[in-house]
Amino acid sequence: MNSICLNFRVHLPYYYKKYHFFDIGVNHDYYDTLRCESEVKRVSERCYLPANKLMMTLLERYPERFSFSLAISGTAVELLESYAPEVLESFKELVSTGRVELLATPYHHSLASLQSSDEFKCQINLHREKMKEVFGLNTTTFANTEMVYADYIGVILSELGFKGVLTEGAKHVLGWRSPNYVYSNPIAQNLKILFRNQSLSDDIALRFTNSYWTGYPLTAEKFADWIIRDPNHRSITLA
């Protein structure tokens, strides 16, 4: 039986105001709250609400065959709490089915893993606490910002108790190996590594609407056929 591991990532940033020289030391209100609210509501109406509705339909239609993982940044949760609580509720409903795994991620969607291990650990712990507070779940799998990964990051994750990590299936890293298998960190071998299938993921994320692409238009049937024809299609991670 072939398995397809679906991962969706949700991040919303805070937007800053135009901050003038003469505001320094006088005005400490840095965020553009009107823009934050507008952007959150726009993406909620155009993306999150319809997508979550579709996901719930699929979960109900295929109770034994469909599940997925979800990585939501801490700032995304904060902004949804403030400006689109109905969206956060829809995420909670998905998670409550028991077939949506929450992944840990840096709280602020930062690249702390490349600069400071202490800050990296701090943001991971903050995020885990937020997921426990909002969704009532403990996270055991990690997805770094932009799927950045190195063996030393894997060691940190293992020390924090993670069982798995999701990362980019970069060709210069994998070489002749297929991304469609589960690997282990060579130092912390209890940490399992899932590599994103770069080609198939980008077919959906980047090339789907490109009318000049040789695979256009991409249909569900065509995509499924590509997966079946892949000689190394045991476990394909799409993110």
Name what the model sees in each region.
Residues 2, 11, 35-45, 190-239:
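Catalytic grooves of carbohydrate-active enzymes
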Residues 68, 72-146, 189-209, 237-239:
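Metal-dependent polysaccharide deacetylase catalytic core of the NodB/CE4 family, i.e.
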